[in-house]
């Protein structure tokens, strides 16, 4: 019974924090996602041109998105290489968009991270979510399930 109540409380908190959302245009402008209002825009440093970062003190997660380098490998090849290296990686289709989803540990601070990579024309777009709890990790999936073409 305790587990059921804990699950219910966590679910309510998760959905209440995700209820108020803002739409964010991803790099290159073709796609958008909805992120919780608790994620606040963090201006990029001049050297980080192209990076869009959002941080939160309450959600126990941060995220950034950016266009990858021109010579980024084909997603399927990259998924196979990551899997061969022991990384939890898979190809997934979300709202008609094929993307690579993988879990890594940030080398700089040891934080767990979920990465998403997908093609926007000839450009690869990378999105990384750093998270501190499983609830925050689950929220990344909810956020990515909102991806859609930018119709504005």
Write out the residue ranges for each language-model feature:
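Sec-dependent signal peptide recognition
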Residues: 2-10
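Signature of long, low-cysteine stretches enriched in small and polar/charged residues
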Residues: 79-122, 130
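Secretory pathway targeting signatures of secreted, lumenal, and periplasmic proteins
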Residues: 27-74, 104-110
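Short secondary-structure junctions
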Residues: 37-46, 81-93, 150
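Hydrophobic core
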Residues: 9, 13-17
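Surface-exposed amphipathic alpha-helical segments
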Residues: 31, 37-40, 127-152
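Short, hydrophobic/aromatic-rich segments at coil-to-beta transitions
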Residues: 20-23, 48-50, 94-103
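Short, solvent-exposed coil/turn segments at beta-strand boundaries
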Residues: 34-38, 55-59, 95-97, 117-125
């Amino acid at each position: 019974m305790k587990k059921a109540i804990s699950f219910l409380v966590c679910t309510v908190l998760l959905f209440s924090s995700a209820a108020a959302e803002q739409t964010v245009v991803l790099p290159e402008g073709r796609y958008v996602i909805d992120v919780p209002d608790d994620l606040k825009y963090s201006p990029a440093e001049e050297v980080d041109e192209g990076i869009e970062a959002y941080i939160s003190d309450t959600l126990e997660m941060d995220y950034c998105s950016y266009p990858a380098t021109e010579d980024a490998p084909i997603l399927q090849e990259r998924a196979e290489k990551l899997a061969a290296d022991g990384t939890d990686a898979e190809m997934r289709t979300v709202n008609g968009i094929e993307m690579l989803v993988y879990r890594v540990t940030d080398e700089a601070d040891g934080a767990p991270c979920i990465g998403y990579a997908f093609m926007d024309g000839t450009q690869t777009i990378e999105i990384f979510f750093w998270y501190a709890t499983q609830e925050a990790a689950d929220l990344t999936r909810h956020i990515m399930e909102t991806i859609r073409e930018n119709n504005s």
